[in-house]
From Swiss-Prot:
GO terms for molecular function: 2-phosphosulfolactate phosphatase activity; magnesium ion binding; sulfopyruvate decarboxylase activity. HAMAP family: ComB. Its cofactor is Mg(2+). It catalyses: (2R)-O-phospho-3-sulfolactate + H2O = (2R)-3-sulfolactate + phosphate. Pfam families: 2-ph_phosp. Its EC number is 3.1.3.71. This is Probable 2-phosphosulfolactate phosphatase. Belongs to the ComB family. InterPro entries: ComB-like (IPR005238), ComB-like_sf (IPR036702). It comes from Microcystis aeruginosa (strain NIES-843 / IAM M-2473).
């Protein structure tokens, strides 16, 4: 298994795809997706465009759908939810489909959606992603951070490093595909005992603090707290494995 890390979807190779893509948006899309599926959502359907989200979700009965929209960290008017994983309670999610569009994570999913296998990961379900990769042993793995509007994201890179670090420790056979893997592991090891402190330091974490999302940051920092793996059933649709 050869692992590559790309800090943003824009940095991935253009004319090829991996055997398995792991998409990360720690703050907060992939944390929310994992939480929604763990809480009983039937599926999570992702959109980069809010207008398309509204059109597609309109074809569903209101009691069977939830719309989650976020731009710049804030909830989009007309949606039921923003992008807070804390809103994904079993009472709200059970049996419903979550239609979601976020600033960054949904764009990263779009870039790799034609890969044979697409999964999503965050700090909270890191080990579930690692277990899947160790079990399936895909030849090539891309771990793709969502970044922020095309730029580098500290927390996504640290999460990618957390996955690569665990793969290396637990298998001993992971091949390093690019230098970003080495750098990401080093970054994760620097912050592994203070993930919340890292979230408070990084630019997107500070953005969320200004929006009074302190509890979201605490939740997103709970590494290996959920044993759930979102996997793509068809392009843009994720289900619980």
């Amino acid at each position: 298994m050869q692992v590559f890390i790309y800090h943003t979807p824009e940095l991935t190779p253009v004319h090829t795809l991996p055997d398995c893509a792991v998409v990360i948006d720690v703050l907060r899309a992939t944390t929310t997706i994992a939480t929604a599926l763990n809480a009983g959502a039937e599926a999570v359907q992702t959109f980069s465009d809010l207008k398309t989200l509204m059109q597609v979700s309109d074809t569903w009965q209101p009691e069977k759908r939830l719309r989650a929209g976020e731009r710049g960290g804030a909830k989009v008017e007309g949606c039921d939810l923003g992008n807070s994983p804390l809103d994904c309670t079993p009472d709200l999610m059970k049996g419903r489909r979550l239609f979601i569009s976020t600033t960054n994570g949904t764009r990263a999913l779009q870039r790799v959606e034609e890969s044979p296998i697409v999964i999503t990961a965050a700090m909270i379900n890191r080990q579930a992603a690692v277990n899947y990769l160790l079990d399936k042993q895909p030849d090539t793995v891309w771990i793709v951070g969502s970044g922020w509007e095309g730029g580098y994201s500290l927390e996504d890179t640290a999460c990618a490093g957390a996955i690569a670090d665990a793969l290396q420790e637990q298998s001993g056979q992971m091949a390093i595909g690019n230098d970003e893997v080495i750098a990401s592991i080093a970054l994760y090891r620097q912050w592994q005992n203070d993930l919340l402190g890292m979230f408070h330091s990084c630019s997107h974490g500070q953005r969320l603090l200004r929006l009074h999302c302190q509890e979201d940051l605490k939740y997103c920092a709970n590494i290996d707290s959920l044993d759930v793996l979102p996997i793509q059933k068809e392009p843009s649709i994720l289900v619980k494995l």
